[in-house]
Amino acid sequence: IFTEWLDPAVLDESNPSKRDPELDLWNPQNPNKPPFTPEYVARFRAAQVARNRRITAQVREKLAELDEASAAWKGDGSGNPGWQQGERDRAFVVSCTQADLRRLDTSLDPNGREPTSLLDLAKENHSPVGLARFTTLRSWLSQWSYDESNADGPKSLAQIKVPVLVVANEADHLVPLTHPRDMFEAIQHHDKEFHLVKGATHYYFGQNELMAGAVEHVMGWMRKKGFLEQEFVEAS
């Protein structure tokens, strides 16, 4: 899902203000507005993947430099390792990671969510906080790289042999219903259940009753499957 959130307008990772105007959702000269055409969606998604791959290439290049410096360090005769020898990773920033078209266009993967305003989405996308904003070279490859990360929900769930409960929020503005449904379908056995919480948003803000109902459903499922000790059930 991370790549589907990446802002593809960013042309220079060191300066996110250098942007492709036709992919910039906040550029008033961009003629593409919601509802977006299938052609624009395809172009936007391809550009998101391309940006992810550019970052991965930069990460690989920097890791190679670190490995080369570490291997070349001969020491200074003191017996103490140099910093070049110890630096096996490096932190970096990924700017602009909140530009999912679905936030603006609720006809894409429709559910019960409300559209996000451009201003609110800008606050998320342009701010110094956000998904994967601060990471490291190796963390990027492990968790966020489109081609190299093993963090693949459906792929992992296909190997699960134990009972599975998938819970989805019907009005979630961040996680489209297609994702939990894909995860559910990826499970190869039949001891699985899909539960949709009607009207629930991503964070359940102001939805205490829906939250309580979701928790009770999970608890009930765990009791039914024998995953809760009786003492814990009574205490809760």
Residues of each region from the PLM?
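Alpha/beta-hydrolase-fold enzymes
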Residues: 2-116
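Active-site nucleophile elbow and catalytic-triad environment of alpha/beta-hydrolase enzymes
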Residues: 8, 137-156
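Short alpha-helix in the alpha/beta-hydrolase fold that links the catalytic acid
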Residues: 12-16, 152-153, 162, 176-185
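Short beta-strand/loop motif that positions the catalytic acidic residue
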Residues: 159-160, 166-168, 172
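Conserved beta-strand scaffold positions in the cores of enzyme catalytic domains, especially
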Residues: 194-196
